[in-house]
């Protein structure tokens, strides 16, 4: 067996290199220690044969050629790095002041990258030649003369270079390749001797020591319970596996002990537990809830008739089955892992919540997501704000700035790669000093951050409940990724205050994500569910906190069974793990299932087709006993009666007292001017633009997103609600679902009940921007974050839960069927601590009648006499409360009087009014935006920003304090744009629902002739403030811009920021050279005969559903074809007239975006011949590729005739994944090339918006300038990015990737192949377009203009 070392491409772009130099310099307390840095990947190849043949070596080199090569011809340092890597030289061989640092996967492990790269190599014919391929990173660093770099590096300074959980660092010598590929011997089983011979130590002393060393977080009662079970009942010592499993299964994180505790407050025993009060909401309003509190997510009856659109299990033809599809809802938090390791912590937070939505009932599926973050003050270097506090942090916990740079990327990356659109969220910062009731200073803030991940999904009605029992003998299966020693003890670690435990235990508790694996698992679940009555899944759970130690026992416990397991059947990437580590690690992307032995072969076939790993690890038993055997070590790690594990350790009792903070009233005399207040408030992150958090996340995948965060022709992120269409199917469906968030944690410093009520009310005011069916249809998820053990916080928690469970929610008729709690929201280190306020995050979910009736803050320009109307639900209050407002926060105040819901009936009447306003035939409401963070002024400004217009804002006169109160109070309310002629109708509907005229007032009007914002004293008509829309919007966008500049390429951040000032920018537009209405007739004409199109996907592809639907709507028969189908002969391309390569992340973009997929075609003889014949020999075929499919086709250019000068698609100039709506033009070249295209016939010259979502879309011509020239001369570019003026552009963000000459789509000379980076298939439903002109829904029949592309192909076929 021979090992090879091959230098790879550049690992870091110049922008990333500059950032890394800056980071390492800062950690070494210098600005100029490092002069230069070069980077590359290293490929380690473990050969099977003694020596690879020359042909095999060349193939291997081709496979491992991707991204940008080192410039060894012109750069001496790059050449030195390449030679040192190729020859495996130590750092000392490079000369003085030059260091070579290598990072490789941790010894004895197999990385996810390795699994995918090895898989590609095997598909390409190297299965008998190459055992495994691994990848490392090499950094060549040149310092100033004489600086001892290695002496100044430590774990903290190197965290920007490697992940010590999964990787190893080599600072001087190169790693021995044997250590990379050699597996360690399994570690032994450990017994904890609770009955030692040394009688000086009691069993409790010994268990207490193990409790600390293992990070079990057991309380005294639980330790007594375990001692009784093992010492007194079983009369034996427990194993470390049994103790660790018990700790995870019974942790606060998993069992919610505080919410089930008995409470005594101020000496009075309380009548209800917290959970009982939450359940009360469901008890009083159970309508439309199918499942609550009993599964991984709550299941709702949406009452929306829809289609189950999926491939037929036999023919693989995409078919529509008409059925009502229940909605499932879930919101999770991943706070502790995000504090420790922000990127993987947030990534696995989203991944875990996605699995919850996939493991509901007997198999389900996520549909769309949300994410949110609360952190302490950002302290952006060079952009520190006057109210921000810098109080330090524990050394091993990430700063707020690092969290907000890395964590959103982690969450977005997982969602993107899995294929889940993220269309809602929030972002808040807080660090403030307050005095407790004794006058002692406390720091309140989010050093322990909140990372929230949630969303909703769907489940077929027959599988909504876990009502098919697992029976004795059922196969117990682990589906998904192989286990590794990561995420150990996450359930227990997240149940204690951060910073209290050991840094090593904290770090060990963070999982790592592999979204492409989770996508494969979801495909398995989808295929099982598509079998209908033959679904082999009896029951399913996701593997989360506690790993298999929680999931597998829970699976059988649900069915009152026991189980017997073989621990060595658990698939592992790390054979050296001990039994405890195998059983308890929290490796991600895993599900546990029960499958009948008779159905095992069906399940196995599905997994094989999807390349999803699985193992039968045990069987259910009638005896309620949990036995885990280890045949390798010949031990029994677990032998427990199920009641011991799931029995009843002593029920928790909580005693607390009511203690209010000592808060002074608001002091507005400290505020120098209205201008200063506006400037500061616009810079507060909770108020300002969240664009930097949104553009990194795909918001168009599935083709069902009818309202995302960005609004209008100028794409400003101000939407109140996220909305999806119900389903794809035979026809356009107008129904849908909505979700919206509400959270008011700062108010909890003043009043817990007010904070809770405001959070619910805010979520409702947001969700009612959508055409919600009724209040009873709305269901809430409540996520409670509390430092429950902090003095006075227990009573606040009880007060808040009581306010919702026994008061507001019953009064409104809304239920809370799902939720989560995190009860350790405190960070401690040294002699410092930062305590979070009680934070209730409410997410409202509801079915929607008509998604096209969703209101947005975009002001309607087609009316001359509209006014802006405020409905102020606090109108009867003599004074407005400024407590906990953004205004006070930016002047380091909290205040002592909070807004609240003063009258439940008025709020309910207002919400009923919104339902009726939506139902009016005439659009009475032209625009809508609720009043929230920042108050009335921010509500109005956001409407102006979205609309690129001016405003005249009228407020009552008075002094500065009066002006500040009117403009910045955050009392409940909303602003409506109403035409003057409809004002009386609007008022009448509100009055009839109990909202009297005193609640309604005109506060201004829009000005579409100017972009000046004026605030006018309505008493004197004096202008008391004036500024331009562009300057105010830039101030509002400043935090987002600064974060984007730190995280992404600063040049593109600056270009986008500058574009805000272009007052003449006309925005998105539809300048079409064809009439989309004609396509309705074409669709009917072509639907009788349906030629077959292969909807082609490789592992990791996620955009097949919307692609299949578009071809179906165009008159084709769409067939689900995987690469394994072609490799194994289940399908042949001869069977199809068309081929559509779908978007996603094939092989997780390992070996380059689309490259692994393409190489599996080019270097597999049988498959290559199929594709070659399809492109070259047949004249009746066409091929289309979008995004990843475009990258795939572009790399097949050698077998597509005339396409040798096609570009490749490389990393975006922004160095970031970009999800945007961009304008493109269908090229109208001198040779009329677009008219030759099978797809673009009749569209030439059209300019229109399209969805974009990719990280590697820059068209790059690597051979020479002549390649680009020849490409353009041959007319092979058929789609180009244009700016809003219609000019071809390379400017960001109008060109989202920096593509040369604006290249967005390319075609073959014969017009039969089209490859494009944007996504037409995602916007063929008109509502899936973020914006379209008024009146087009009826005119175009619900279809978007891009449906023409697919119907043109159908006409070409004839």
Swiss-Prot record:
Segments forming domain Glutamine amidotransferase type-1: 1093-1358
SMART domains noted in UniProt: GATase_5
Main location: cytoplasm
Entry-annotated residues carrying N-acetylthreonine: 2
Chain segments annotated as coiled-coil in the UniProt record: none
Region Disordered, residue ranges: 339-363
Matches recorded under NCBIfam families: FGAM_synt (TIGR01735), PRK05297.1 (NF003672)
Name of protein: Phosphoribosylformylglycinamidine synthase
Organism from which the protein derives: Saccharomyces cerevisiae (strain ATCC 204508 / S288c) (Baker's yeast)
